[in-house]
């Protein structure tokens, strides 16, 4: 009974955590603290953010939106604009609330979409409890459904599709982004990506690095690879700079 109440009505408790600089993180779902801990406590992205002005952000695999909120709270002097792309139905409430957060003054846009092959209108997405969802099922118990494939024309805030920073954490679908949305990459200055060895390109990190090098990117910093949680394989984090980007 208690577990059911916590699952269905967790958002009614209005849990919030102060971040500094008058920003707050709201925890609307019962597993939100896991994501909050990764971003705000472990600060897994801290060493992978370039020391440059970052105003226009594309947040792919936004989950509960904490990366964009973390970056804004770290840089209160900048008015950051973020497009948060997340296919999960479980994250809808949190991302809608964040997009409406008054202190952000409508600078965060939320798109419920999957980074798949844009030749197809919809992409199948798998939910996984207490971890990020994925385009790839990891067990027979994963719940799946169809989600609209990301359409670049819906990014109304940035018609030129150029970003200072693209953050990409797609649980294996990063290869889809690199292949099918290369125009966004080529017009963006920095890329911070969590890579996964099971991405559909089949060649692990080296294949990703080779393709990015072909596009004109240089890896500036890379973490050690580690065993993935929840499935076989490895993952890691890196920062890359577009050497062809015109300021």
Task: Please provide the spans of the model-predicted regions.
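Phosphate/nucleotide-binding beta-alpha loop and adjacent structural elements of enzyme active sites
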Residues: 1-247
């Amino acid at each position: 009974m208690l577990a059911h109440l916590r699952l269905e009505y967790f958002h009614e408790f209005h849990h919030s955590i102060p971040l500094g600089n008058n920003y707050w993180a709201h925890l609307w779902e019962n597993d939100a603290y896991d994501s909050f801990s990764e971003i705000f406590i472990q600060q897994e992205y801290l060493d992978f953010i370039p020391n440059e002005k970052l105003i226009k952000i594309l947040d792919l695999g936004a989950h509960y939106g904490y990366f964009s909120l973390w970056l804004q709270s770290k840089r209160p002097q900048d008015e950051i604009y973020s497009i948060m792309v997340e296919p999960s139905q479980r994250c809808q409430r949190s991302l809608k609330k964040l997009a409406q957060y008054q202190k952000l003054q409508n600078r965060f846009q939320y798109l419920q979409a999957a980074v798949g092959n844009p030749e197809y209108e919809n992409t199948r997405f798998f939910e996984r409890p207490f971890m990020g969802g994925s385009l790839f099922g990891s067990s027979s118990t994963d719940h799946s459904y169809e989600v609209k494939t990301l359409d670049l024309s819906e990014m109304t805030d940035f018609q030129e599709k150029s970003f200072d920073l693209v953050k990409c954490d797609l649980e294996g679908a990063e290869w889809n982004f690199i292949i099918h949305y290369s125009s966004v990459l080529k017009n963006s200055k920095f890329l911070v990506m969590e890579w996964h060895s099971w991405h559909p390109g089949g060649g692990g990190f080296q294949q990703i690095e080779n393709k990015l090098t072909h596009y004109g990117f240089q890896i500036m910093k890379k973490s050690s690879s580690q065993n993935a949680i929840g499935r076989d394989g490895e993952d890691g984090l890196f920062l890359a700079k577009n050497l062809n980007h015109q300021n």
